[in-house]
Amino acid sequence: MSKTHPPELKKYMDKEMDLKLNGNRRVSGILRGFDPFMNMVIDEAVEYQKDGGSVNLGMTVIRGNSVVIMEPKERIS
């Protein structure tokens, strides 16, 4: 059985992130935590809908296997 390596997301902690999820869903919010499977806790999360609207989700957990693309809203050094 292979050992799971934790994702290197520490530099993104407490930063605002844009996430594209499977099913063509988009969420943005502040990364507050993660685990070795890249499940993430996102605070002040907002889901952007296809019709241009948005839904405030508050604090939510996003499963790592549903993340397609993840990028910070501002440059990280």
Swiss-Prot record:
What cellular component terms from Gene Ontology apply here?
catalytic step 2 spliceosome; cytosol; P granule; precatalytic spliceosome; SMN-Sm protein complex; spliceosomal tri-snRNP complex; U1 snRNP; U12-type spliceosomal complex
Principal subcellular localisation of the protein: cytoplasm
Hey, which family's this protein in?
Belongs to the snRNP Sm proteins family.
Q: Where does the record place the Sm domain?
A: 4-76
Q: Where in the cell is it found?
A: Cytoplasm, Cytosol; Nucleus
Q: Record's CDD domains?
A: Sm_G
Which Gene3D superfamilies does this one have? 2.30.30.100
Q: Does the keyword Cytoplasm apply?
A: yes
Organism in which the protein naturally occurs: Caenorhabditis elegans
What is this protein's record name?
A: Probable small nuclear ribonucleoprotein G
**Keywords assigned by UniProt, alphabetized:** Cytoplasm, mRNA processing, mRNA splicing, Nucleus, Ribonucleoprotein, RNA-binding, Spliceosome
Q: Which domain of life is it from?
A: Eukaryota
The keyword Cell inner membrane is annotated on this UniProt entry: no
How it assembles, according to the record, is: Core component of the spliceosomal U1, U2, U4 and U5 small nuclear ribonucleoproteins (snRNPs), the building blocks of the spliceosome.
Summarizing the function annotation, the protein's role is:
Plays a role in pre-mRNA splicing as a core component of the spliceosomal U1, U2, U4 and U5 small nuclear ribonucleoproteins (snRNPs), the building blocks of the spliceosome.
What Gene Ontology molecular-function terms does this entry list?
A: RNA binding
Q: Which GO terms describe its biological process?
A: mRNA splicing, via spliceosome
Pfam families linked to this entry = LSM
Q: Where are the transmembrane segments?
A: none
